[in-house]
Amino acid sequence: MGEVTAEEVEKFLDSNIGFAKQYYNLHYRAKLISDLLGAKEAAVDFSNYHSPSSMEESEIIFDLLRDFQENLQTEKCIFNVMKKLCFLLQADRMSLFMYRTRNGIAELATRLFNVHKDAVLEDCLVMPDQEIVFPLDMGIVGHVAHSKKIANVPNTEEDEHFCDFVDILTEYKTKNILASPIMNGKDVVAIIMAVNKVDGSHFTKRDEEILLKYLNFANLIMKVYHLSYLHNCETRRGQILLWSGSKVFEELTDIERQFHKALYTVRAFLNCDRYSVGLLDMTKQKEFFDVWPVLMGEVPPYSGPRTPDGREINFYKVIDYILHGKEDIKVIPNPPPDHWALVSGLPAYVAQNGLICNIMNAPAEDFFAFQKEPLDESGWMIKNVLSMPIVNKKEEIVGVATFYNRKDGKPFDEMDETLMESLTQFLGWSVLNPDTYESMNKLENRKDIFQDIVKYHVKCDNEEIQKILKTREVYGKEPWECEEEELAEILQAELPDADKYEINKFHFSDLPLTELELVKCGIQMYYELKVVDKFHIPQEALVRFMYSLSKGYRKITYHNWRHGFNVGQTMFSLLVTGKLKRYFTDLEALAMVTAAFCHDIDHRGTNNLYQMKSQNPLAKLHGSSILERHHLEFGKTLLRDESLNIFQNLNRRQHEHAIHMMDIAIIATDLALYFKKRTMFQKIVDQSKTYESEQEWTQYMMLEQTRKEIVMAMMMTACDLSAITKPWEVQSQVALLVAAEFWEQGDLERTVLQQNPIPMMDRNKADELPKLQVGFIDFVCTFVYKEFSRFHEEITPMLDGITNNRKEWKALADEYDAKMKVQEEKKQKQQSAKSAAAGNQPGGNPSPGGATTSKSCCIQ
């Protein structure tokens, strides 16, 4: 068989298309595609402009896909697309303008410039300091970015949008232009522009189609780059907020340390060579001694810039963070005006206007005087700058953060502005923490000062203590110089006899005694309870404490020291005479009597409701039991003073228990809580009757802390209301004092609150006092003393006292009712007589049928 020629094979394949296709797919298709994808360069001749064949165009597309797959550098991928487009469009050169927003203004900046079919990337890549920037209202590229549509300009000289300043800079003549936006959704990302058609007078419709077709590659590249960049920025932003947040909440006391910790921690995510933070002086008003020299003409007035809220711009501290080379941090207190971060005037400008300033080419900047030479031995120079204010929640500028030289050499862009603004905004808001801490610290210091002032006026001084502890008279020395035995000897002579003054009796009256004598009686009660020696109470501290308590009560009508003492005396009587002491330890008895003496200290003569209505600070401080909690805190404040602390020698557990008992006892005097606890107390009384022996019940109660606390709470109520159980001669006088204080509150409600008081506090209804007293006894008081007399029969005298006083008040109430009834009857008779007299007047008789008669005429 002879050799087969190429012509014969070609003829055979043309005649058998199906076989040719099958053979090709089986033997060559995979290899061909593999060769195409594996080829490093497309087999297309780019040396001369010519119309590519379909095969060449396919190879170009494969080349672009391969390049996009292998190359992660955005500029290089776009550069390759533009080189291919130069050949396909037969354009002399092409350029890429990136869309960005700087200082809130959109603009286009050259990124790839003068790309042609034989260009090298390094020659076409525009460095940040060599950028050509177009605003959107300038040039054809600005018009394309604004309209978001392709533009084909056949003749630039006839186009109104064309601007020749680039031609002047480059000494190049632009004749025709084909430009198109690269979009990401509805947003412009970049503008790609081809200039000067090589083989024609202008770009054709065919060129537009080619540009749009290959623009899909550029669009995809830019979209991937843009999404990757956004992802990177958001990741950095999240890390910055996370780490700065963690450091902000570590440091709540000082703004400088707070800023430093946050800014130093996030330094790796800021993507810049240096950043500087200037902290502004927050003083709004100068001291008079600083103003006088200005007013006297000795010092010129300040004429520099001011913050939007009127403060002089004075950076009291600058912190420099140097991240290039060897990391360093420099803190400059009271920086001079020529400090490298301030000398340009940019931080002051930002502080004055509150604007974000993004400067892409600092050496070429005319408005700000940036240093154009290296700042230090490292040769570092300022290239681009981003500066923004740090604003707190009050919209006051507290500082300025300035970032220098983005690490990749590009100028700071919109995403950098957003990222840095998030950081500075967070730092500004976090200023609230140290501000709040400082305010709280000042309030705490003021509170301590005021407490010191109060204690100075309330505490028993060295002259007053000599009225009881007469150490100067007896020993010729001060109390603290005496031994406890010497003080005990003086007190034994000075303190009253318990039996003589009847301080353990339920019918005790304070009226014949002076306030100083009441203080002495109070001291004697501690000795009667035998707690002074047992708990090693310093006798000087005991005397000072009781005397200070008497001074702590205000000089008001009823809730004064006499009332405070009476409550303490009744507590003492319930424990001793009422035999309730057997349920409580000596420590608890000490705490209960002390709480009773303290229970109304610093009372203002008005009740809790008035504190709320008048919006008294006490009402804002304490949510419930307002005055009771204030009395408790006042008493604790006195006890915290070493010279007054009668609990100073208790161990920790004893001290905590004593304070706990005082807390319950004083809060329990709130009558609003009385109705909640009396049912529980009644159950305890009922339970006590189920025990056969008193000893078993006592042993049970001593171990039941909750029941003991309920009994103590009811004891405090019984003590607080004990004036109602006193002999009539005493009770009638005390009731008038209580009523007078109520009427004073009623007057305040009328004058201050512009409200009508309740009848109990209305002095215009003073005659109704007996009736109100009967109601108060029946509704509030009787239950307490009836249950206590049932609980312990030794307390029956208190029930007898209230029963007798009710009779007296009831008699007065009946007398008042009878008097009012007589007055009402008399008034009715007078009205009847007046009506009868009016009926006998002419024209006064009613007309027939009930019609009203005329006063001026009558019908005959």
UniProtKB/Swiss-Prot annotation:
Catalysed reactions, as listed in the record: 3',5'-cyclic GMP + H2O = GMP + H(+)
Domain GAF: 73-222, 254-431
Pfam families the UniProt entry points to: GAF, PDEase_I
Propeptide boundaries: 858-860
Modified residues (N-acetylglycine): G2
Positions of region (Disordered): 821-860
GO terms (BP aspect): cAMP-mediated signaling; retina development in camera-type eye; visual perception
Keyword Acetylation belongs to the record: yes
InterPro entries the UniProt entry points to: GAF, GAF-like_dom_sf, HD/PDEase_dom, PDEase, PDEase_catalytic_dom, PDEase_catalytic_dom_sf, PDEase_CS
Compositional bias segments (type: Low complexity): 830-851
Cofactor: a divalent metal cation
Active site residues according to the UniProt entry: H559 (proton donor)
Binding residues for a divalent metal cation 2: D600
Gene Ontology MF terms: 3',5'-cyclic-AMP phosphodiesterase activity; 3',5'-cyclic-GMP phosphodiesterase activity; metal ion binding
GO CC terms of this entry: photoreceptor disc membrane; photoreceptor outer segment membrane; plasma membrane
Intracellular or extracellular location(s): Cell membrane; Cell projection, Cilium, Photoreceptor outer segment
Binding site for a divalent metal cation 1: H563, H599, D600, D720
SUPFAM superfamilies: GAF domain-like, HD-domain/PDEase-like
Membrane protein topology class: Lipid-anchor
Keyword Secreted: no
Associated disease: Retinitis pigmentosa 43: A retinal dystrophy belonging to the group of pigmentary retinopathies. Retinitis pigmentosa is characterized by retinal pigment deposits visible on fundus examination and primary loss of rod photoreceptor cells followed by secondary loss of cone photoreceptors. Patients typically have night vision blindness and loss of midperipheral visual field. As their condition progresses, they lose their far peripheral visual field and eventually central vision as well.
Family: Belongs to the cyclic nucleotide phosphodiesterase family.
Record function comment: Rod-specific cGMP phosphodiesterase that catalyzes the hydrolysis of 3',5'-cyclic GMP. This protein participates in processes of transmission and amplification of the visual signal.
Protein name: Rod cGMP-specific 3',5'-cyclic phosphodiesterase subunit alpha
Organism whose genome encodes this protein: Homo sapiens
Top-level taxonomy: Eukaryota, Metazoa, Chordata, Craniata, Vertebrata
Protein encoded by which gene: PDE6A
